[in-house]
Regions:
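Active-/binding-site microenvironments in catalytic and ligand-binding cores
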Residues: 1-314
Length: 314
């Protein structure tokens, strides 16, 4: 079952993921990078060699300063943007609770625990969750990535593969769909790749304005077997425009099944709520789905993540 025989992950298989795909200790007891360790000097040089058209494409959504009309639960805590306009200058203040389903951000490895900390839950690399304090995280925080994330990005454009505007809610993206897409566009996965999965977020919401939003939402997205693809190919991170699929073939013992494995066990960062629509058009026009990807998290000491503006370079 799972990726190998192209069938949805069972409950038993999902439970095994936490040991099968654990990277605890793989890069030493002091590791703070997780799967970003897969990004070698050679991988960065390879990515740099992909820049020959002189094009740059943002993969971010605008910071959301308002609730969504008629669907307020999609952004229950809008960003606070205040202008300060003087006689000869201007400035502004921005405050944002960036985790959720609207703002483009990267999750640090302190964001998700293996379970309730009062019942033995741990952080990535078997660290004590009490190291995450009200003053900030003392380990696994986003400021360990202050030098930026630079690697080859690969767009997995699943709506394009299915000739759809967006992925159907009852047809989750599975690991073998990523395999099929890569083969169809001539991509050979490389260790350190940023796997960027497009579901067609904007098109979905345009067509489903009154779709009932819950937490987690029942939107289209990715099934747990995607975890197998990431691990087997030594991916450095997963980026997505829509996150876990709301439709699940089985009742997994997890609220957000992919988050709950890849962050605390695998040590893999997640680029949440990206926008890959313009990137999709650029990949189609250039005839290639690989590019240099640059992500520069804010240096937030003890931060659980950061708003980001990922840039794809061709």
């Amino acid at each position: 079952m799972g990726l190998q025989d192209r069938t949805p992950t069972t409950v038993e298989e999902y439970a095994s993921y936490k040991t099968r795909f654990s990277n605890w200790g793989r890069w030493g007891e002091d590791d703070q990078l997780g799967t970003l360790n897969h990004i070698t000097d050679d991988q960065i040089k390879y990515a740099a060699g992909l820049i020959n058209e002189g094009l740059s494409v943002s993969c971010a959504n605008p910071i959301a300063t308002e609730q969504v009309v008629g669907n307020q639960q999609r952004n229950p805590r809008p960003a606070d943007h205040r202008m300060m306009v003087g006689a000869d200058s201007s400035g502004d203040y921005v405050g944002v609770a960036f985790h959720g389903y609207v703002n483009t951000h990267i999750d640090a490895l302190c964001h998700i625990f293996t379970g309730d900390s009062s019942m033995g839950g741990r952080l990535y690399n078997d660290r004590d969750p009490n190291l995450v304090t009200d003053a900030g995280a003392l380990t696994n925080s986003v400021d360990y990535w202050k030098d930026g994330i630079v690697t080859r990005g690969v767009l997995y454009d699943i709506p394009a593969m299915r000739s759809q505007e967006y992925v159907s809610p009852d047809e989750p993206i599975e690991g073998w769909h990523l395999e099929d897409w890569a083969e169809s566009v001539g991509i050979q996965p490389r260790p350190g790749d940023a796997v960027l999965v497009r579901s067609g977020c904007d098109a979905f919401w345009r067509a489903n304005e009154n779709f009932e939003f819950s937490h987690p939402p029942a939107t289209p997205g990715n099934g747990p077997s995607v975890i197998e693809y990431l691990y087997d190919n030594d991916a450095s991170l997963l980026g997505w425009d829509l996150q876990e699929a709301g439709y699940k073939h089985f009742d997994y013992p997890a609220r957000i099944p992919i988050h709950e494995v890849v962050i605390p066990y695998m040590g893999l960062p997640l680029l949440d709520n990206a926008n890959f629509d313009e990137l999709s058009l650029t990949c189609k026009s250039t005839g290639r789905y690989e590019f240099m990807l640059v992500i520069s998290p804010l240096v937030i000491r003890g931060g659980t993540g950061s708003p980001v503006n990922p840039i794809a370079l061709f």
